[in-house]
Amino acid sequence: MPYTTIDDLVNSALDYVIIGGGTAGLVLAARLSEKDSVNVGVIEAGLSRLGDPKVDMPTGAALMLGNEDYDWNFKSVPQAASKDRVYHIPRGKMLGGSSAINFMAYGRPCAADIDDWSSKLGLPGWSWNELLPYLKKSQKLESDLPNIKQRDANLFPFLADSQGTDGAIHTSASPWHVPFEDDLLPALDKTSGYARPKDPYSGSHVGFYRSLWAIDRSKKPVRSYSASGFLAPIIDRPNLKVVTNTVACRVLTDSNEDGSMRATGVEVQHDGAIHVLSAQREVILSAGAFQSPQILEQSGIGDPAILHQLKIPCIIGNRNVGNNLQEKLLSAVVYELAPGTMSLDSVLRDPELRKEHQKLYTEAHSGALSGCINLTGFLPYSSLVTSDDIDDTIGDILSLKILSGSPQSPNQNGPFQRWQREAIAARMKSLNSADLQFVCTPANFDTANGYGNLARLSPGSPAGYNACYSLVVSQMYPLSRGSVHSTSSNPLDAPEIDPGFLSHPADVDVIAAGIQFADRVLSSEALRGKVGRRVVPPPSLDLQDRDQVRDFVREHIVTYHHSLGTCAMGQVVDERLRVKGVRSLRVVDASVMPMQVSTAILATVYAVAEKAADMILADHP
């Protein structure tokens, strides 16, 4: 596949320079270059991994996590609320960014998640109805495949009108699942008391169901991600130039006659040499939730006090840059299955079974290697706890109860921060809010050993146990806030990431309630004889004792890879994603999302980028 040399890019008359060829950046590259008269340049720090089997195979993420050829392999600072653990924070280091290294979950947010951006935060253009066309625009539902056409709509629900069919990102359903899930899904329904959603992609997804994944099953199943979907089909466009192995150091700015600042280009490093790329129209920062704020700070845009410490001249002071970091967390309940019942652990343990599933993947496009997670579901917090528990949690939310020493926003009681707390508190009271997600995982999900290196999350069942099954729990609307900032004036130094995990007690409460529910399901009468011993939490832990469950949660979490909010709309960028105080500079990636949404953020990031492309083209007709 042809790529551009750095010299060619330096000598090109570029209208737009996109920093980051990741999930959002390649959407912009494809859409902006549809206009023949526009010249687009893309800078990517990683390499191209198109056609790489580790990227393509749906179960290949475990081979990339922690591998610095594929993963930036960031680490958090020690987390006080979790006994000073240091967490692995993966980010894709290649064309496609984190869409090339994630677990390919495809979901859409609740309508209220997006409507709040518009109605409560005052961001015109960002309602659910205004974002939905862009959610559909990026998607290509594989509607002709038998497992879609002949699906049981009660098990695998969606309405055809809500789906996109002409987009770049394939979405599909797995043709294979472990037999245990035939019994698990009714047990989830009965224990929760919630019916299955009619269409979890139309703005409400409470209940349990088989879900879509970003996997292209038109031939042998492969990951569908921004490099394969948006870039590969159009890489030969003469007005699109992509250079890899090139790090953006800082955005270059100049002053206008009226004293205002504007972005003029980007300083980059390639093979140790510094180069300057000029942008005639705009510089667009799409480096992700950790590196977009880092590059802003390296460019002199950020908190003046932090920039002073780094000896970086302050061009535009904005104390919000790098703050408001939000990340969901995962914990899990793990049971062994009855003797002879298979899960992915069986495939990991048995070489002959592994060969069988490799053959299924290659020849029948099925089996565990084609994508083994099928079931997910969402429940309200209020459906799982007592009214007194709800009152206690909401009291903590509204009273600014935060662990001492945790990262905090510059103005904890400002309108933006109050809006977040009030929105989450209102959701916690509702019996229709998707506050918790449950990911049904046919393997031992080992958070105790995986937090520092996510490649160790699925080690197989422990010695002396049968194959295992996990109900993985996540809180969708975390209250804890973190930060990411540069550590020096050297743009090659990794940023300091302090997610503030579990620094707000409400996050512990919500995950603990999910752990208790997961155990009620797996120990229910409906699954008697289908499961054996509880593996995690250990049988000695009393899951009826909320304090014991809270302690368990603090020691058994990993990241969900959904970090966002560090260049938030309304704080760092405006509603058209323009950096405040600097003309011709935008940020387009997960960092602009002001608050977490209920579900994986992949589809929302694609939609934000699709919408941003239209806004950019409208501003430069």
Curated annotation (Swiss-Prot):
The active site is at residue 562. Gene3D superfamilies: FAD/NAD(P)-binding domain, Glucose Oxidase, domain 3. It holds the Pfam family GMC_oxred_C. One of its GO terms (molecular function) is flavin adenine dinucleotide binding. Keywords: FAD, Flavoprotein, Oxidoreductase, Virulence. Pathway: Mycotoxin biosynthesis. FAD binds at residues 23-24, 44-45, 102-105, 590, 601-602. InterPro entries: FAD/NAD-bd_sf, GMC_OxRdtase, GMC_OxRdtase_N, GMC_OxRtase_C. Its cofactor is FAD. Its EC number is 1.1.-.-. It is an enzyme of class 1 (oxidoreductase). Homodimer. Dehydrogenase; part of the gene cluster that mediates the biosynthesis of the selective antifungal agent ascochitine, an o-quinone methide that plays a possible protective role against other microbial competitors in nature and is considered to be important for pathogenicity of legume-associated Didymella species. The pathway probably begins with the synthesis of a keto-aldehyde intermediate by the ascochitine non-reducing polyketide synthase pksAC from successive condensations of 4 malonyl-CoA units, presumably with a simple acetyl-CoA starter unit. PANTHER family: GLUCOSE-METHANOL-CHOLINE GMC OXIDOREDUCTASE, GLUCOSE-METHANOL-CHOLINE OXIDOREDUCTASE N-TERMINAL DOMAIN-CONTAINING PROTEIN-RELATED. Belongs to the GMC oxidoreductase family. This is Dehydrogenase. It comes from Didymella fabae.
